[in-house]
Amino acid sequence: MIEQTRDITTAAGEMETFICCPERGGPFPPVFLLMDAPGIREELRDMARRLGTVGYYVLLPNLYYRAGRDTMFGPNVLEEGSAERERMRVVRTKMTIPPIMDDLAAMLAFTDGRAR
């Protein structure tokens, strides 16, 4: 299995993206695995790996990249009233559908341009 982190160029900057796929064979159909509110974490990387092992080219983008590279939250991010939850809420509320659609268009362009 190939695992790598690549920057995908978007209209807003470089979007850090975890990518995995099988080492041999192909072509591999792309799968865009979008994070939920708590953001990128090992559980999502594991899901991407599982999809990669069965023949997909999986892209897991950090959709919070506009808030800073490697934007991550602590383990209590889902606990009501926690500081991490409030920090996540502030970042999340700045995300709207149009920029996310632009990010997806950039991901499509990236997958179209990759070696088959």
Where are these regions (language model features)?
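N-terminal cap/leader regions of alpha/beta-hydrolase-fold enzymes
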Residues: 1-116
